[in-house]
Amino acid sequence: MRFKGLPLAFLLISTAARAQTSASAPSPAPSPRPAVAVVNLRFDGEHANVLQAGDTAIVAAATSKLLATLAASDRLALVDSTTVATAVAVAEGSGNPCDNACAVAVARKVGARWVAKGTISNLSNLVWLLTAELFDATTGKPVLADSYEIKGDAARMAPAAAHVFAQRVEKTIAEKGSR
């Protein structure tokens, strides 16, 4: 059978080659996910009578949960925690703890648009407080500030509070990241 003077076999090969070419053409790259840096949570013992042996472990567990929750997100890219910790250590070289301005500077240094930081305070034997913030590193301004009162087993509840904060960070970045 002929189609306008061409053999059918030629027409099929030509159509298949065009389909292959358009199928192998690269699709547009997805927009990059916004980068977020996390400055490790710190223990604020200002209100505690005595630093207990497990206090730093509670803060470490909360930091770990915050990092894990953000790392699992498909809406943002978490900057490597070792890279952030190294930048914080350099910034703290003068002996001052990394404050808000330091956290923003660290985010800029590691190429992150966003930076999260916070403290955990032991208010009493039964009550702890996680205070955490998210900053836009382009403006240096906070875009999210949360406090979570932790009652009961702090070793279990502090990571749970950090998980909730991480979810709020993800949502805030998704809402503000496109602006």
Task: Annotate the PLM regions.
Residues 14-16:
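N-terminal signal peptide c-region/cleavage motif recognized by signal peptidases
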Residues 20-36, 43-45, 64-66, 72-76, ...:
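C-terminal/domain-edge helix-coil "capping" segments
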Residues 1-7:
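Bacterial N-terminal signal peptides that target proteins for export
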Residues 72-117:
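Short, solvent-exposed, polar/charged sequence segments at loop or secondary-structure edges
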Residues 43-48, 84-86:
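A short, flexible beta-alpha/helix-coil linker loop
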Residues 39-41, 81-82, 119-120:
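Active-site-proximal beta-strand/loop segments in catalytic clefts of secreted hydrolases
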Residues 48-61:
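Glycine- and acidic-residue-enriched helix-capping/strand-helix junction motifs
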Residues 48-49, 90-91, 128:
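Short, well-ordered secondary-structure micro-motifs
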